[in-house]
Amino acid sequence: MGWMKDETGLDKNAANFVPLTPLSHLRRAALVYPEYEAVVYGDTRLSYAEYYRRCTRLASGLLAQGIASGDVVATLLPNIPAHAEAHFGVPACGAVLNTINTRLEPDTVAYIFDHGEARAVLVDTTLLGLVKAAIELMQGPAPIIVEVPDEQAGFPASGDHMTYDDLLAAGDPGYEWAMPQDEWESLALNYTSGTTGRPKGVVCHHRGAYLMTMGTAVSWEMSRHPRYLTIVPLFHCNNWNHTWMMPMLGGTVICCRDITAGAIYDAIADEGVTHFGGAPIVLNMIVNAEDADRRDFNHVVNVFTAGAPPPAATLAAIEPLGFSVMQVYGLTETYGHVTECLWHEKWDSETDESRYALKARTGVPMPMAEDITSMNAEDMSQVPKDATTQGEIMIRGNTVMKGYYKNPQATAEAFAGGYFHSGDIAVQHPDHYVQITDRAKDIIISGGENISSVEVEGVLMKHPDVLLCAVVAKPDDKWGEVPCACVELKPGAKADEAELIAFAREQLAGFKRPKKVLFQELPKTSTGKIQKFELRKVAKDL
């Protein structure tokens, strides 16, 4: 190892070792860029000095409500300034941030509240009904509700709860942030769908988030003062860590509450947006925008897209409009994207067909990832880099989660062999680029959001006419994938597609509902296991 013979007196100390945390970025930005725009939302424009003060008041206000170090503070918010502030203000008081998908149903939100033991929740006025319904289903104590109204969007405070402004007003602007004493301390708790049907709590540490911000800035070739549009939900992998990254560069976070083609074009033309991330559905939205929604702009907009390989036709249509698109890949367990389909100039002369095929590959490790490769999950051997032999994508590095909260068995399984097992099946090309060929564990990725097929199956199996059910992904031009339910009815049963979809609608969030129902005898193995790979073939041809 790299130790010299005599290292007496060369120990770590307060002068030469400081725990890495993305909180440092905003503290520095408040000093270095105090007058630069930090956050923009319609008529709201916050300088870095103001942004830092508001985050400080949030941290102090939470402490005044009894929030202690290590407590979980949840959010159910759209992409608005309060959500960006929560990314700094919550951990600045030592608490752990739990951003919750706003599209979930009450039962799942209740489970997340209970499992994470949320002490408080910052909730958009439009989502108060969801939170109250979830609290009714909880087993444990309810979180403190802090209502976040949005008068700019037409949603004033209900008057029934403490408001976000009340919380900030009670905070001390002179409060000293509680910076982590150990960079392994928990920063965020994010829930991800799994094949068990219940979401798993992914715990992220300060070190990983800090390194994500550094590596992303390098991969995106960012210079100072980028203008970043929040299309990726701030609840999704903490906005891929981009909100934590922007203060490092003195950049501007431009909040987008409602994602529409018109809103995107307006932000680019009026606010000079230089970067954004989004699923391929966002690219399709831009390409297929109505003429009335389109705006002219004279600069290149850099885009990270993830969730599915961008279709060649979409790339061919969007690039001439002024967008430079790179596919990235990652998971909640890896803080977001950890691979990039890095472009090489030698490919510029390739045919369009070849270029788009190259751009559809999953890519190579980003700078903050130690190793990402395709391996045989049985013996952890590297698969041949022949673009044909399939293996599982394995990931190792400092931007891999601490583990699954309160689930040591799942954590041990995920880290077996010294790598994180992604569950995604891929080949590896001779130039080391990985390319996903299939999704393992039956997760359906629709519009960038994960759907547990087991959860959907569990709901449909409650219908009195259903004997067996299997849910698989059906390719979809708009969403990438949508749930397709393959159902075997009980003898004499007469339920039809409309009835089953309506039944599912009563119990599932909109994006989880089956968009197609097929009635057939389900293929099974000799032991009675449903052969989903056969059903995927059927769904693919629909």
Please place each PLM-identified region on the residue numbering.
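Structural core segment of the AMP-binding/adenylate-forming
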Residues: 64-65, 92-169, 491-493, 506
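Conserved pre-ATP/AMP-binding loop-to-beta segment of ANL
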Residues: 34, 146-147, 156-165, 169-191, ...
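Conserved structural elements of the adenylate-forming
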Residues: 52-60, 169-174, 188, 202-224, ...
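Conserved AMP-binding/adenylate-forming core of the ANL superfamily
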Residues: 14, 18, 35-80, 84-88, ...
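AMP-binding/adenylate-forming catalytic core of the ANL superfamily
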Residues: 75, 104, 121-123, 276, ...
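Gly/Ser/Thr-rich phosphate-binding loop
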Residues: 165, 248, 273-278, 287-357, ...
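Conserved AMP-binding/adenylation subdomain of ANL enzymes
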Residues: 210-227, 235-275, 288-289
